Design a protein with these regions (language model features):
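Charged, alpha-helix-forming regions
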Residues: 1-285
Length: 285
């Protein structure tokens, strides 16, 4: 249980509870590269200089691509047994919600608050134990993964600072976890220790979508992990279509890849694919 002073701070923060009116979705090259093994996650005890990846960042009007050294790794040996899994599109959606809460001025937050931010819900709408558990696992994973990133060249190209060296090695989500009473219940509360790292980097490029809560609500369909991933993909792709009308098709296979479905032709998962297509149609309508 947190110390009395910390508990008072939590209760004070939640007494002023208000909800963000929109969700921030990070849409830069780094955030787009992380999910489903786009950037492999290494382990601290086996790291070498060869593991650093040179991520190529493009910018309209730039004379040449920007090279950004990046390394993603698990900081704790124990996660090999627990959460040593790739960063998924669902984890990305959770991180976007954390960035949203941080930007809205929250110092403390809960898994329920993250889920509500992901789905445009109010604090009156309940969160199921399953949904809370999925968010909690994702938060724990983000707190276990560290990102080394040198975005000095990006900073310079986007003219955010001259001759400024920006090298960061920190958790994707730097937060303390504590138990406290809020609203009469004992809950797990997280406290931001710094700005979520992907959001911090994103503010250099400014490639961010702001999605009104009305577009996040899925009353006609249960907001499962897969539905949240599909919804996030569709919102990003629709924004891309707005910018380039020639690329106005939504491919099922691209969504299947986002969901981690490797072989859509596998007859054993026909039922799963049918349900996912139904979800896509309902979300688009």
């Amino acid at each position: 249980m947190a110390k009395n002073e910390e508990i008072m701070n939590v209760q004070k923060a939640f007494s002023k509870n208000y909800l963000p009116l929109e969700l921030l979705m990070l849409n830069d090259k780094l955030s787009n590269s992380l999910p489903n093994g786009g950037l492999p996650i290494k382990y601290k005890d086996t790291l070498s200089n060869d593991d650093v990846i040179s991520l190529e960042i493009s910018k309209q009007g730039a004379k040449k691509p920007i090279i950004m050294p990046v390394l993603l790794y698990y900081d704790d040996e124990r996660v090999k047994l627990n959460t040593g899994k790739p960063w998924t599109p669902y984890d990305r959606a959770v991180h976007d919600a954390c960035a949203t809460l941080y930007e809205a001025g929250y110092e403390y937050f809960t898994a329920d608050m993250v889920y509500r931010a992901m789905n445009g819900l109010t604090d009156k709408e309940k969160v199921s134990p399953q949904a809370r558990g999925a968010v909690t696992k994702s938060l724990d994973k983000a707190m276990s993964i560290r990102l080394f990133i040198d975005y000095t060249n990006v900073q310079s190209t986007y003219k955010r600072g001259k001759n400024t060296e920006i090298i960061v090695d920190s958790q994707l989500l730097a937060a303390d976890r504590l138990r406290a009473k809020a609203g009469g219940y004992e809950v797990t509360v997280y406290k931001f220790l710094r700005k979520p790292l992907l959001y911090e980097y994103n503010q250099t490029t400014g490639q961010i979508l702001k999605i009104p809560n009305e577009l996040l609500k899925t009353k006609s369909i249960k907001s499962t992990e897969d539905v949240i991933v599909i919804k996030s993909y569709l919102l990003r792709h629709i924004e891309a279509i707005r910018k380039n009308r020639r690329n106005n098709h939504i491919r099922y296979n691209a969504i299947y890849e986002e969901l981690g479905i490797e072989d859509p032709e596998d007859r054993a998962i026909r039922g799963t694919l049918y349900r996912r297509r139904q979800a896509i149609h309902k979300l688009l309508n």
